[in-house]
Amino acid sequence: MPPFISHFFLLSTFASLALCSFYCKNPGYPCLNGGTCLYNGECNCTSGFRGFNCGLDSSTISAACTVECHNKGICYNGDKCYCTKDYMGPTCQQAYDFADCNKSSMKIKAYRPTEFNGEMFLMQSMFGCKLAEVTSTIAGYKQYELDVPHDSTGPCKLKKTIDATTGDVHFEVNVSTIHHAGQFGMYDGLKTVSCHYSSRDQAIVKDVTNQDLIVSVTASDGSTPNLQEIPSNDVIHLTFKPVNLPGGYKAVKILDLEMYSVVEQWNEINSMVLLKDQCMTQKADELGYSVSNEVDGTSGRAILKAIPLFENVPAPVHFNYRLRFCRNRCILKSCASPSLKPMPKGEIFKHQGQGIRIV
């Protein structure tokens, strides 16, 4: 057969590959409990049985279950899960085809029945991008893997897209399965596996202090830097600036922030949690600290009112904090707005100035 005819046959066969994972005409995918394999690769179940392979006895389906079945799995016998055709495991938590999304690569993995004697490869290159069989981590299945670097430029190159707004990065690739080596048929499959790297998620959390030389922490009133004293009820700008972040990380934001004061002669300490999981706490709001959590370029900044923790005692305030480091830029979560507080009954309303007219 001339080479160009063979090449055309290969391309046209790829175009006809199916998208589903179970075909009873393929080795290792039988119809159970007396089910019949139809011409289209689906199972026709006998009375009382159901499911893609007729493997579920309808009389055993449980309304109450002691386990949680994932990915649309069905609970039976009270503590077991019958999975859909694309998932496996005790609670249907494991996909047959998936990827481990690593820092610099995408490791493609797949499980197949022990009767499987075919091949798996990336759609764009049958010969250069095969998944290799490795020692299986799940009994009763064969396991296949291929580790593809994110920056691969060869035949195994991944499809990469970047969200211009969020900076999120998405990699994907089509994985072909043929059930008879060197042969293509209408019951062979094609699956898309992907990795999504969110600019919010690509980060690490670390307890830090100034001695770690990872960030510098400065306090100001918005104009004068590195303040050591600030009048009560003035505004504090507390800035966390990256200095020597771990490899690959460029920006920082504040997760948690606590202010505390110690009066040594009384052996007492007072503290106030200002930010929790990036948002101002209800108590800080009620006591008037008016905390704002912000991102300024690569730095994280908290702006708050300077309210002493001890009345009439000049005790310095200190801060405990937890930070998140981000690879590109940090994006803050959306926090619920503080609730409006009604004026107590009998309170005389006082105001000064002409105010602002809202039009």
UniProtKB/Swiss-Prot annotation:
Record has Nucleotide-binding as a keyword: no
Entry-linked InterPro entries: Dev_Signal_Modulators (IPR050969), EGF-like_dom (IPR000742)
GO cellular component, one term: extracellular region
Main location: secreted
Record domain EGF-like: where: 21-55, 61-93
Keywords, sorted A to Z: Disulfide bond, EGF-like domain, Repeat, Secreted, Signal
Cystine pairs: 24-37, 31-43, 45-54, 65-75, 69-81, 83-92
Record's signal peptide: 1-20
Subcellular location: Secreted
Keyword rRNA-binding assigned: no
Tissue specificity field: Prismatic layer of shell (at protein level). Expressed primarily in the mantle with highest level in the mantle edge and lower level in the mantle pallium.
Matching PANTHER family: EGF-LIKE-DOMAIN, MULTIPLE 7, EGF-LIKE-DOMAIN, MULTIPLE 7, 8
Protein name per its UniProtKB record: EGF-like domain containing protein 2
Organism: Margaritifera margaritifera (Freshwater pearl mussel)
